[in-house]
Amino acid sequence: MRSRVLACLAAAVSAAALLTAPTATAATASRDCRVPAPQEPGTSQLQQLHSGGLDRTYQLHLPANYKSKKDWPVVLAFHGRGNTGVGTEVFSKLSELPAILVYPNGVIGTGDGDRQAWQGAPYSAPGVDDVAFTNDLLDELEATLCMDERRVYATGKSNGAGFVGILGCVEADRIAAIAPIAGAFYPNGIDCKPSRPVPVIDFHGTGDVTIPYAGDADRGLPAIPDWVQGWAKRDRCLIRLWDQKIGDDVTVSRWFGCARGTEVQHVAVTDGGHTWPGADSYSGGGYVTQTIEAHEMLWNFVRRWSL
């Protein structure tokens, strides 16, 4: 059933995309790719990087068929507050994608417990520049892997998704498309003026009590539809197509006619919790839809774009 649903969705997206097809761009490898990879294909290993005076880490997964003569797309996946790169790899299934997967680890922030967090939240570690860390990380990946610099995508959950929103604002020259899930979009003082229109696909459960779908004025959290509409306006989208129902609990909203062929999509899970759609293991509190698989749906969206 799920495969049939996804096939119908893909057909609908392909038909609508004819309205504003993005410009195809030739893939560009970051180097001649003759340097051996830092680990065996098909494995996930913890790697280290010194950035901003701190020793940082990230979980790196190479596809089983990784070869040093092909330029690979890269997906950056940012964990939620208190989680880890390893934990996110487990529930997200992102490592099943035909791409290099990178799961960075945040720095322990403020508040209760020793919980890792990302820049832009009220509990983030003071003075830590995670945007600079992301740039250092991309520089490291470009130097050590055979990757396509034009096909770098960013996703994340909760606090990690909020940080992905920041990257969309300030790193549009390095991040081709973003896919936040259950995003915690706190006020961060950043004037969001990306250098180019950014394709966005956003996922959120209407029953999320951690980051409410309708927003939370006391915490400065916007209503999720308003946040998505902000990106549609930023990307100068002209057309909002009809909403499409997938199964009994998923509704997809789409904006087309956007500048430079970009698109904006919002995937609302009816009664969905603070969870990763399609997860088979714990990803947060509340209902988890199995109607869609977030990793497949976001990949089918972001892979259509390159810088």
Regions found by a protein language model. Name each.
Residues 203, 221-222, 234, 238-307:
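C-terminal catalytic histidine-bearing segment of alpha/beta-hydrolase fold enzymes
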Residues 2-4, 22-74, 155-179, 183-185, ...:
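A domain-start/cap signature at the N-terminus of enzymes
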Residues 184-200:
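Flexible "cap/lid" loop of the alpha/beta hydrolase fold
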